[in-house]
């Protein structure tokens, strides 16, 4: 797949991820061979840091099916800990109050994301009038 996707994992969907042995159900549509291989790197890194990753792949539709699933889970009060979401949709979820609090902003500041991430990408990862990171690039 040669498309350039601005794909993120909105860790802030669920505000209470414990630092000691965090568990995260991750909704995504990276299901093809190459995508799944790339995702395995993220899973391994999370596991290496003591995390327990529960995979929730949703195939088909270039992410449309996954977004329908995510919306249904949010409405049911059962949002996953993290989800792959495309840029502008992040602000839409924020406008609905789904992402708050912006837990990932502290990580972004500590790691200096504003110096590492282009402004164009960062604008899709920030909420609260584009002042705080609410998603990871």
Which residues fall in each region the model found?
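Positively charged n-region of N-terminal signal peptides that target proteins for export
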Residues: 1-4
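Sec/Tat signal peptide C-region and signal peptidase I cleavage site
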Residues: 16-20
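Early extracytoplasmic/lumenal segment of secretory-pathway proteins
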Residues: 22-25, 31-90
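Conserved donor-binding loops in enzymes that form glycosidic bonds
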Residues: 28-29, 137
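Hinge/lid segment of periplasmic solute-binding proteins
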Residues: 87-137
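Bacterial N-terminal signal peptides
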Residues: 7-15
């Amino acid at each position: 797949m040669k498309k350039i996707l601005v794909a993120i994992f909105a860790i802030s969907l669920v505000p209470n991820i414990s630092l000691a042995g965090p568990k995260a159900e991750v909704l995504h549509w990276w299901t093809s061979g190459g995508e799944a291989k790339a995702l395995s790197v993220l899973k391994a890194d999370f596991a290496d840091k003591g995390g327990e990753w529960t995979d929730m792949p949703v195939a088909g539709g270039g992410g449309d099916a996954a977004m329908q699933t995510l919306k249904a889970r949010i409405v049911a009060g059962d949002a996953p800990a993290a989800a792959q979401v495309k840029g502008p949709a992040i602000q839409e979820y924020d406008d609905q109050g789904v992402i708050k609090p912006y837990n990932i902003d502290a990580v972004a500041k500590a790691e200096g994301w504003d110096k590492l991430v282009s402004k164009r990408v960062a604008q899709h990862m920030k909420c609260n009038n584009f002042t705080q990171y609410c998603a990871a690039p």
